[in-house]
Amino acid sequence: MSDVDAPESPFPALFNFRDVGGYAAGDGRTVRRGRLYRSDSLHRIDETDRSAFTALGIRTVIDLRRPSEVERDGRVPDYDGLTYRHIHPEHADWGANRFDDSGVSLARYLADRYADLARTGTAGLAEAVGLIADSANAPVVVHCVAGKDRTGIVCALTLSVLGVPDEDVVADYALSTAASRRFTAWVRSTLPDAEEPPPPFLESPAETMELFLTELRAGYGSVEGYLTHAGVTDAQLESLRTHLLD
């Protein structure tokens, strides 16, 4: 496993912001740092965060939230030189399939939700990966609400197609559990009357991503096969490897 740990976020109001780089790929190269970041919702950063955000050189923000979530909470500040792309991979409202009513483990529940998103959100996922593949957009930050589910899928697909071993892809995904707990602690301290988040929001079991990747490959032959099915071109896949691997 690559020696990559979850760093402290440079932004006080973000809890799952981190560099996706640093992982070893199967061909001896390494995923470049400072090119792709993942995060929970960026609407909580403000003018006091401008210098830290600018220091990262971020050019593009990919927001995977539902339109209603963007309308409710707002978006990343409109910093100079920043391109904002709202891409919502279509998927069912999880409220219609509550974990408490599912009768399965949390890992199985989440993996099923991810599989549903991979089936219905192909266009959005392909668009997001295509944007990441274009070096002119880098550095890129991809985020959703908690930065673990929709963002976790996009980052897992990206790392996998770069040749990062499943062990590391799964470990990167599982880092979001600690981030969710930090967020929950912050909510308790700042909004004591807020409702406790449900288990699917708080946990990122490693088994979830193991199941998702295994079953995706069973259906499409490989992660690359899935991305091609979704609409990512061979040229985009080659570009992804060219600029994200050292």
Residue map of PLM features:
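Cys-dependent protein tyrosine phosphatase-like superfamily
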Residues: 1-141, 153-246
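Ser/Thr-glycine-rich phosphate-binding loops at phosphate-binding pockets of nucleotides
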Residues: 146, 150-151
